[in-house]
Amino acid sequence: MLQGHERSITQIKYNREGDLLFSCSKDQKPNVWYSLNGERLGTYDGHQGAVWCLDVDWESRKLITGAGDMTTKIWDVEYGTIIASIPSKSSVRTSNFSFSGNQAAYSTDKAMGQSCELFIIDVRNADSSLAEQTPTLRIPMTESKITSMLWGPLDETIITGHDNGNIAIWDIRKGQKVVDSGSDHTAGINDMQLSKDGTMFVTASKDTTAKLFDSESLMCLKTYKTERPVNSAAISPILDHVVLGGGQDAMEVTTTSTKAGKFDSRFFHLIYEEEFARLKGHFGPINSLAFHPDGKSYASGGEDGFVRVQTFDSTYFENIFE
């Protein structure tokens, strides 16, 4: 159990090796933890608003965060210093490094008279001058705002999940939409996470389902049904398992007994779509989930401001569907 945030967690992410766990919350300060023993290594101090998203590059050298103070910041992971701070005209909802680490993408909210926009920036030689540079690509979103985002293979495309349940793939060379999923989801998408090999990704939606999609065609492969909105979903890197977390919207939560099972992490079989386990822990909805890259543990961040790291016991790895 990692205690270091004063307000609800918005996103958690492991680095590629899995030794570091990054968390951001509505209390303005992203944290980094040593995932093995839960020791807090440091905080990234500099935002003036709720931090909505973060991502770390492959080499664990740079961290990107987007916040409600209308800035995207790039940090030095080791020293905690700000490399660049990029202003925008509304709050930043998603931010991701590309696989190569040469580029980063972020999206802004549709608010204060501003439309939602997707930006791509070159971060190879990132320094304070990045704030004045024009982004390499800027795509205005005319329909629904972006709520989550992934990079496609070879840094050629970006997959966006929207507030109306749509998913789209954008070709960043042409700057236009190449695939649209249509309306597989009937309500907003809260989270999208790729599988380890990048061939498919799982979505978490307010329509109470999580779905598995093909990364290239956006064909819906599987559906995992629950009774309440799903805030986050992640795919195990070693087994055919998906974990879902959610609960009601923060506004609708009353102090209910945890026995009601509303705030459990729920494990589904990737292929059979069957729920096989639930893990308790949080005193409120789960906002973000992440599997450790070795698949032997997972972390969850909740509305209660805690990050919980749970290690699986040996029985988890025995195939229960034989």
From Swiss-Prot:
Keywords, ordered alphabetically: Cytoplasm, Initiation factor, Protein biosynthesis, Repeat, WD repeat
WD repeats: 4-43, 46-85, 141-180, 184-223, 281-322
SUPFAM superfamilies, alphabetized: WD40 repeat-like
Subcellular location: Cytoplasm
SMART domains: WD40 (SM00320)
Main localization of the protein described in the UniProt heading: cytoplasm
InterPro entries documented for this protein: eIF3i, WD40/YVTN_repeat-like_dom_sf, WD40_repeat_CS, WD40_repeat_dom_sf, WD40_rpt
Residues spanning the signal sequence: none
Subunit record text: Component of the eukaryotic translation initiation factor 3 (eIF-3) complex. The eIF-3 complex interacts with pix.
Family: Belongs to the eIF-3 subunit I family.
Summary of the function given for this chain in its UniProt record: Component of the eukaryotic translation initiation factor 3 (eIF-3) complex, which is involved in protein synthesis of a specialized repertoire of mRNAs and, together with other initiation factors, stimulates binding of mRNA and methionyl-tRNAi to the 40S ribosome. The eIF-3 complex specifically targets and initiates translation of a subset of mRNAs involved in cell proliferation.
The name this protein goes by in its record: Eukaryotic translation initiation factor 3 subunit I
Species this protein is from: Drosophila ananassae (Fruit fly)
Lineage: Eukaryota, Metazoa, Ecdysozoa, Arthropoda, Hexapoda
Encoding gene (name): eIF3i
